UniProtKB/Swiss-Prot annotation:
InterPro entries xref list: DiS_bond_form_DsbB/BdbC, Disulphide_bond_form_DsbB, DsbB, DsbB-like_sf
Topological domains, Periplasmic: 28-45, 87-140
Predominant location: membrane
Protein name: Disulfide bond formation protein B
Role played: Required for disulfide bond formation in some periplasmic proteins. Acts by oxidizing the DsbA protein.
Amino acid sequence: MGDWLLRRRGLALLLVLTLLLNLGALGLEYLADMPPCPLCWVQRGVFGLMSLVALVGLVYFPRGWGRWPLAGALGLSALTGVIIALRHLYIQANPDAVSCGMSPEVLAQFLPWWEVLLEILSGTTDCTQVDAVLGVPLPGWTLVGYLALGALGLYAVLARRA
């Protein structure tokens, strides 16, 4: 029973931390005047997805083989976040790699959603602006967050009983 409770607390901690990270992003946006670029919005969405997966894990909390789909969803969402954060860091390090484009709102009016997503993931000139906290660019912090929270989530779901 103690091991089950410990793993459940890990998922609860994952849920709280991902929600706090998104709340912190809103604080940076409105209080520190750091408007998000399209890739920042996608990264917030990935943290939201991790929150949703953690909530499903808390409510359903599968055992045995049932925990593997939950671990897969957590791992896949964390990996997606890592890839997007690395892409964002690449764009910030190489601002010439992106070109000026239309805003996602305008694209959404004319293109199918998957093409809009591909355009967002390719980056815009808005994504080249480097906003840093404690000297580290924000995508660097999100990269650390995805790695740490992905590891926490996988440990909470897959840890073996002692």
